[in-house]
Amino acid sequence: MWEDSLTVFCGIDWAERHHDVAIVDDTGTLLAKARITDDVAGYNKLLDLLAEHGDSSATPIPVAIETSHGLLVAALRTGSRKVFAINPLAAARYRDRHGVSRKKSDPGDALVLANILRTDMHAHRPLPADSELAQAITVLARAQQDAVWNRQQVANQVRSLLREYYPAALHAFQSKDGGLTRPDARVILTMAPTPAKAAKLTLAQLRAGLKRSGRTRAFNTEIERLRGIFRSEYARQLPAVEDAFGHQLLALLRQLDATCLAADDLAKAVEDAFREHADSEILLSFPGLGPLLGARVLAEIGDDRSRFTDARALKSYAGSAPITRASGRKHFVGRRFVKNNRLMNAGFLWAFAALQASPGANAHYRRRREHGDWHAAAQRHLLNRFLGQLHHCLQTRQHFDEQRAFAPLLQAAA
């Protein structure tokens, strides 16, 4: 194996302003140590130090570091160098192998990381060699998902505030798709941030507000509905207190508008980038996967096909495969808690959407429920099956085939 021929290993203990570097040989002898700054000069100093100890394009020195992000990692990943992102908890266990005094220092941690590669490189996985487009999709998809979560967080704050003084607004918008994040809800609440102002809205003002929000039909029905709600009797705060709550609502609505705009803009950017990728057609052939959800899945699994040796590895990474804990007479099989949470989040949405889009997926889910699985367990089981099929399709460059994927279940249903 390629790691058998390596004789030099590098460990980096990273920080915000500087990084400690340690280089060891295959016997554990410290060849060099240094502290570099977190800038171009520091990165060049690191590359020069590696070159002094045999680093080249043909024989790059592998590097261990406790992060997979940042400009330092990007500089190290140029070329064919293997960069290993070591979990800090795992690194802490290695620190105790050579002493129990629990002493700790940044140069010492860099040495520990270098020795991890020297002794146990085969047990750790290098960062995947994803394409530039796949890395861009990862950035956009994660940013869009974060924007959606931020939007919901601010919407929850708006909802909590409205419960304090403005129940009519909740009655008017919360039951509709999108709830308080809807454009018409945000426009109307900006026009009338208090119950007193809402009760004074005229039909013309409501019509203008709905038009400004982008609504194009069913004006009269919606206008009458809103006016009826806003002029109904509800419990009220004192006038001065109500006005103060109104100012707070306007501040939150400005934040909500910004998060909604960010989520929409990022969704467009994600979809455009995703459709440029060669794997997009395969992902979109699966039931339940659209451009946005497909991009989230691709963002987490990447396009380095050597990353997962088999479907089981992908399932374990996603957290859909169960884990076994056995010791003596004890034997337990349960769900995984250490997993890629973003991939699992996208996977649950994928499995749920597939119930309506795929008869085979629906039959699989129903069979698991009949066997006693709860909803979440049945969805996780369905996702586990989908991931195995996705791994096969990506490796063989095939599109999803409903008849082949769920043939026994479809035959039984027929």
Curated annotation (Swiss-Prot):
Q: Which Pfam families match?
A: DEDD_Tnp_IS110, Transposase_20
A GO term, aspect molecular function: transposase activity
Q: List each coiled-coil range.
A: none
Gene Ontology biological process terms in this record: DNA transposition
Q: Which UniProt keywords apply?
A: DNA recombination, DNA-binding, Transposable element, Transposition
Q: Which NCBIfam families match?
A: transpos_IS110
Question: What is the protein name for this chain?
Answer: Mini-circle putative transposase for IS117
Q: Give the organism the record lists.
A: Streptomyces coelicolor (strain ATCC BAA-471 / A3(2) / M145)
